[in-house]
């Protein structure tokens, strides 16, 4: 049985391990900073998915999702942003990402958010398919960028 809950500081090593399994880069400083800014903070969300068997944790962590509420950027009303979502490869396709996404959306809605956004690379078909399957579509903003070199 997969259960979602808010992250606690003890989850940090498992988050670092899962991220490094998927990205092949061990980003210890990045995740320490992210935990400090998101875990237990109002308007910020770090949710964990665990595989539970009879109340005991069978596998410490099978996925996580991170997001926050942002307000008034370029005239935007306060809205939720999903910043990252990861699910262990052997657990993908089992609805865990959907469960995490639904949990973060519920938490944001409980905090009076009416819109949830995310940003993905155009060629990231896996995440594009996932977020579209959750009902997300192109929004009213366009990302612009330039090199500062």
Regions found by a protein language model. Give the residues of each.
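Acetyl-CoA-dependent GNAT
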Residues: 2, 6-10, 17-77, 83, ...
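Conserved active-site alpha-helix within GNAT-family acetyltransferase domains
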Residues: 98, 122-140
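Hydrophobic adenine-recognition pocket in adenosine-nucleotide-binding enzymes
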Residues: 7, 85-87, 120
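Alpha-helical elements of Rossmann-like donor-binding domains used by nucleotide-donor carbohydrate transfer enzymes
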Residues: 14-18, 33-34, 99, 103, ...
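Conserved acetyl-CoA-binding loop-helix of GNAT-fold acetyltransferases
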Residues: 87, 93-106, 133
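Solvent-exposed, non-membrane alpha-helical residues enriched in polar/charged side chains
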Residues: 35-36, 105, 128
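Conserved GNAT acetyl-CoA-binding A-motif
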Residues: 108-120
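Short hydrophobic/aromatic beta-strand or adjacent loop that forms the aromatic wall/cage
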Residues: 43-44, 139-143
